[in-house]
């Protein structure tokens, strides 16, 4: 995401594999609840709440913010009691956290994940994990159209669209967690091209979630949060299953070079944002925290999820415009979005990230 945000309920990213250290070693800053996802009655084909309830709440996976400060988040289709059916739901909040409205994303699956506000169209682009589609939603008219649909290019796999970002020309990039691909399309959408893929010549499989022999990887998501550095010379992509950040060089013609592992040891990195100093803010869903990694791959700060939330809360998405974050709690009945107070705090120490599970990558000839 281009703006500074930290968000998502039912989110997945953590640093549980970091070497242990005393909790007081980090200034974790202030965290306040920003908003709470409301209960709603699902609509559309197969609409249902767990336990046959008439209405329910949902975890949320992503969060984005418009230039006027309006905050958007979409339902992920699960809560502590199970899965929801029907269309996904888009929630709209005022800059002060007040719920303005919510409505169904007609045509979608229940499982909406990453989303970005597209200023050129004044629309919200939403990745649909269940259908391999990016939806374009007009939040004023509450209408939905298909922006792009990803094809299957890896045998035995289906598209699993997850996170989105833009380049400086307005092109849209979408991570595919199941096929290990970064898709690209123009500002108006349409048929995407595989900007980065295991099948592209000179590229590799560092974004796939496939385990090495004898390994069990969980959660089984490959390419996840994606973001360019400020100079647009590299795109960083998180591999949740491998606890890693992959750095993909951007060539002068805008094409992708060969990705390399930038750092590893993050326990389920999920959401990603890049600040003005090229620090990477990673939502860590197994450690219930936001971890800040500097341009050299060192952890320089941590932001904790609100202590008011149970330890089962999960942090998934990141977005930097307002220093907000969202978190899901499986132990409770609500899905809060939390506000993280910036600027980046000074830390008592920094440390390198130890290695996590390694991948023997294969580069396409």
Model-based region annotation:
Residues 20-25:
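Sec/Tat signal peptide C-region and signal peptidase I cleavage site
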Residues 93-98, 138-142, 186-190, 249-254, ...:
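Short loop/turn segments that connect beta-strands within beta-propeller blades
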């Amino acid at each position: 995401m281009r703006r500074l945000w930290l968000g998502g309920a039912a989110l997945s990213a953590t640093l549980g594999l970091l070497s242990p250290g005393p909790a007081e070693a980090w200034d974790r800053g202030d965290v306040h609840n920003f908003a709470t996802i409301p209960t709603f009655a699902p609509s559309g084909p197969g609409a249902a709440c767990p336990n046959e309830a008439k209405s329910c709440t949902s975890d949320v996976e992503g969060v984005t913010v418009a230039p006027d400060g309006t905050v958007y988040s979409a339902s992920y289709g699960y809560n502590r009691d199970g899965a929801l059916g029907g269309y996904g739901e888009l929630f709209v909040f005022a800059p002060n956290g007040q719920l303005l409205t919510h409505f169904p994303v007609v045509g979608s699956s229940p499982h909406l994940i990453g989303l970005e506000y597209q200023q050129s169209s004044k629309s919200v682009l939403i990745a649909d994990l269940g259908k391999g589609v990016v939806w374009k939603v007009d939040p004023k008219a509450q209408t939905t159209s298909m922006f792009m649909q990803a094809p299957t290019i890896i045998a035995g796999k289906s598209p699993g669209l997850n996170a989105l970002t833009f380049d400086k020309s307005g092109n849209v990039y979408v991570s595919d967690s199941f096929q290990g691909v970064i898709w690209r399309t123009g500002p108006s959408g349409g048929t995407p091209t595989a900007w980065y893929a295991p099948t592209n010549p000179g590229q590799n499989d560092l974004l796939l979630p496939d385990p090495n022999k004898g390994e069990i990887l969980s959660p089984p998501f490959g390419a996840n949060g994606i973001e360019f550095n400020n100079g647009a010379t590299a795109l960083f992509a998180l591999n949740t299953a491998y606890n890693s950040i992959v750095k993909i060089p951007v060539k002068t013609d805008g094409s992708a070079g060969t990705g390399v592992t930038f750092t590893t040891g993050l326990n389920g990195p999920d959401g990603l944002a890049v600040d003005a100093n090229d620090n990477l803010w990673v939502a860590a869903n197994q450690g219930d925290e936001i971890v800040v990694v500097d341009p050299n791959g060192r952890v320089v700060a941590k932001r904790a999820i609100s202590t008011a939330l149970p330890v089962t809360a999960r942090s998934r998405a990141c977005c930097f415009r307002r220093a907000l974050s969202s978190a899901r709690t499986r132990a409770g009945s609500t899905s809060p979005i939390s506000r993280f107070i910036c600027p980046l705090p000074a830390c008592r120490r920094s440390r390198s990230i130890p290695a996590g599970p390694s991948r023997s990558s294969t580069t396409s000839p």
